[in-house]
Design a protein with these regions (language model features):
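Eukaryotic intrinsically disordered, low-complexity regulatory linkers and tails enriched in Ser/Thr/Pro
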Residues: 1-146
Length: 146
């Protein structure tokens, strides 16, 4: 089965249909605004930084996986444990540090509009998730492509 290149979303503003190229999605987050929670989809595109949509990050992830696209990770924000979806293609570095007595994993991105995000999952756990979902991860042990 070939990968579908697009996903259908709905604008938070007026519920209109939005068709987005999956490979251009970098990060999906849940944010709070004056009206409550909203889902923001960030793009790796010079023409658009982000959109707010009605779908939850969980639903977007489920739709992406159902379309046979495995370049995405479902992680949890270190701030509020909210689900965040990350495109592995934009990850530059993953590191861990201690903040307020808690281990926090910071992921740095190769993206102009989003520098980094922090997650609950350890770097080791994220690496294992990437090995499972991505066949082109290079292992640190032998420096060969799996």
């Amino acid at each position: 089965m070939s990968k579908n290149k697009f996903i259908k979303l709905h604008s938070k503003e007026d519920n209109s249909v939005i068709i987005a190229r999956i490979s251009k999605i970098c990060l999906v987050t849940t944010d709070n605004d004056y009206s409550g929670k909203m889902t923001t989809v960030y793009f790796d595109d010079e023409n658009i930084d982000s959109i707010t949509v009605n779908e939850t990050p969980e639903k977007i992830y489920q739709n992406i996986v159902e379309l046979d696209n495995t370049d995405f990770l479902k992680l949890h924000s270190s701030d509020d444990n909210a689900v965040m979806i990350v495109n592995t293609e934009i990850i530059s570095v993953i590191s861990q540090s201690e903040e307020d007595g808690k281990n926090v994993t910071t992921m740095y991105f190769n993206n102009e509009s989003i520098e980094s995000a922090s997650f609950n999952e350890s770097p080791e756990r994220i690496y294992k998730m990437m090995e499972i979902t991505n066949n082109d991860v290079v292992t640190a042990d032998n420096n060969e492509t799996k």
